[in-house]
Amino acid sequence: GNEIYRRCTALFPGRKSFTVYDPCCGGGYLLTVLGFCNHNIGRIMASDVSDRMVSVAAKNLALLTLQGLDGRERELTELIRQYGKSSHLEAVESLRRLRNRLVRNVESTVFTADCTQTLPLADAPDIIITDVPYGNLVSWESGEKDSLQAMYRQLAMAAHSGTVLAVIMDKRQRYKGDSWNRLERQVIGKRKFEIYRLAKTD
């Protein structure tokens, strides 16, 4: 994910700060890792069709703030007091390492949304990066006949003229529309990623 994100930022020469959005965020792991590894992320937006996953993502993305790290450390300290497990002690050490990586608080907005329908974004993101459902989940939960194409259409409507989109997917999946121009494609085993920029309209 990090390498893909950096390829996206390279398309914005001179840009110092980015708003990043994942419309299929799951537990928010991709965005949380990106937030710790890239100090040019100023704001994160994340959504998923599952309320349960949105709740997990909100908790993970909160670690990108000192307040969130403090809260998690308090939880772990209480678990250590109750159970004394070595795994909890290791988690506290990991948390302290994360604190050292955090240069500034990263604001995050996490919400439930079906990315094949109209997305309630207050602002257009600079970079959209997502690892889309695949396998038995290819029809997703929206009931859309072709959820992948519907997602691309909705993201085009939520984007600004310079927005860059990176999609990680099964290598058999492909984009069939004309709202996005593909800039890059790479296959890695059974998966691939493609990077796009919004097509210019006359």
What are these regions (language model features)?
Residues G1-D202:
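Class I S-adenosyl-L-methionine-dependent methyltransferase catalytic core
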